[in-house]
Amino acid sequence: MIQTAFTALLLLAIGYLLGAIPSGYLAGRWLKGIDLRDCGSGSTGATNVLRNVGKGPALVVFLIDVGKGALAVLLAKSVGLNDWLQVLTGLAALAGHIWPVWLGWKGGKAVATGLGIFLGLAWPVGLACFGLFMAVISIFRIVSLSSVVAAIGLPLLMLLSGSSSAYVVVSLVASLMVLWRHRSNIERLLAGTEPKIGAKAKG
């Protein structure tokens, strides 16, 4: 029991630290000498990297952020943690990405890391959400709209997949976290002022 509790706490800490790896911030600093927290949307995620650093760095940041989430839950699975502890490890990674200790608790909007988490937990659901994201972005070319639609679809897809209650609950929590992080984007979407891909405005 003590060993299991220690392992769980260790994985939660590792999950948070993985999520807190500031890939977007480092891309801005190393490649352009800028602090992404002071640029565009203020997010350190791939979308803000795309707008302020470039396409190549944005793709690398996206892949790293996906990897952070996937690695966290795969580590939890590899040591035999139950479903609830797996999802808590995933949420720890999500929290690390949104509130990284290294950057004054100001990070990304959790979309890429969230995708990684659900690819690790239930890859068919993760792929379905990514497909939904890509379908919306190909039509409207608005990243935030695609993120919001995918976030709303996530718990529904998880429920329909017949996954465990732990996975369904974490999908709902993650969805709400992503929507909360996109609240200003949602306001602009409703106002019709949210920028499309390629724009330099806030996003």
Curated annotation (Swiss-Prot):
Q: What class of enzyme is it?
A: transferase
**Keyword Membrane among record annotations:** yes
Q: What SMART domains does the annotation carry?
A: G3P_acyltransf
Report the catalytic activity: an acyl phosphate + sn-glycerol 3-phosphate = a 1-acyl-sn-glycero-3-phosphate + phosphate
Signal peptide positions on this chain: none
Primary localisation category:
membrane
Q: How does it sit in the membrane?
A: Multi-pass membrane protein
An example GO CC term for this entry is:
plasma membrane
- Give the EC number(s) listed in the UniProt record: 2.3.1.275
Keywords recorded for this protein, A-Z:
Cell inner membrane, Cell membrane, Lipid biosynthesis, Lipid metabolism, Membrane, Phospholipid biosynthesis, Phospholipid metabolism, Transferase, Transmembrane, Transmembrane helix
User: What pathway does the annotation place this protein in?
Assistant: Lipid metabolism; phospholipid metabolism
**Stored PANTHER family:** GLYCEROL-3-PHOSPHATE ACYLTRANSFERASE-RELATED, INNER MEMBRANE PROTEIN YGIH
Family according to the record: Belongs to the PlsY family.
NCBIfam families xref list: glycerol-3-phosphate 1-O-acyltransferase PlsY
Quaternary context: Probably interacts with PlsX.
Q: What is this protein called?
A: Glycerol-3-phosphate acyltransferase
Q: Which organism is it from?
A: Synechococcus sp. (strain CC9605)
Gene name linked to the record: plsY
